A protein has these predicted regions:
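Conserved small-domain helix->loop->beta segment predominantly found in fold-type I
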Residues: 187
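Catalytic cores of eukaryotic secretory-pathway lumenal/extracellular enzymes that build
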Residues: 1-162, 168-170, 176-184
């Protein structure tokens, strides 16, 4: 979504799994209307997601995808840009900022993986709200993370099974969305 305005800030937004660029369609007009600066918004599909082809080479990890997306920004004529990512998009965006600090002038992540500092008491200073979030994360790891282990260890098995069943694929993905979001406002 190009603004065609002088001084527009290029913003690359990268989705995660099981998402696609579709998750950005409603936010693009809001960003345009509420931003204090004009934005050129670029939302590429991760390789193998949405309408993009599957990777043809082994090793298509977040770091390599970041290199490809940087090449895309360069090919589009952007020397400096800002990135945003969630889920897998956050790891790609992090790599873009790390690998291309002269080009990536800003980063926003809505999934940040961080670990407590080492020390005698890593929980020192953790608030009650933060403890509740940690409890929720532990519940998620024990009850909602099985899909990740299956996809990580046996991707071909689940891939073949879901490829032959549109209902199975829809159930596999929609179950994640319903489990991850609460409330009627999250539609």
């Amino acid at each position: 979504s190009k603004s065609y305005q002088e001084g527009a800030v290029p913003l690359m937004m990268t989705h995660g799994w099981p998402g696609s660029i579709q998750e950005f369609l409603k936010i693009i007009p809001i960003l345009r209307e509420q931003s204090k600066v004009p934005l050129d918004i670029i939302c590429p599909s991760l390789p193998g997601f949405g309408f993009s082809d599957k990777p043809t080479e082994i090793g298509m990890d977040s770091e390599n995808i970041a290199k490809i997306q940087h090449e895309l920004m360069t090919a589009l004529g952007y020397k400096k840009y800002v990135v945003q990512g969630g889920d897998w998009g956050s790891t790609v965006s992090k790599w873009m900022a790390e690998l291309f600090p002269e080009n990536c002038i800003g980063i926003h992540l809505n999934l940040v993986i961080a670990f407590p500092p080492s020390g005698d008491n890593p929980m020192e200073g953790v608030t009650a709200d933060e403890l509740k979030m940690l409890e929720n994360y532990e519940k998620y790891k024990s009850q909602g993370f099985g899909y990740f282990e299956i996809q990580k260890t046996k991707p071909q098995t689940i891939g073949y099974g879901l490829n032959d069943s549109p209902i199975g694929l829809a159930a596999w993905i929609s179950e994640k969305f319903y489990g991850w979001f609460e409330g009627s406002d999250n539609k």
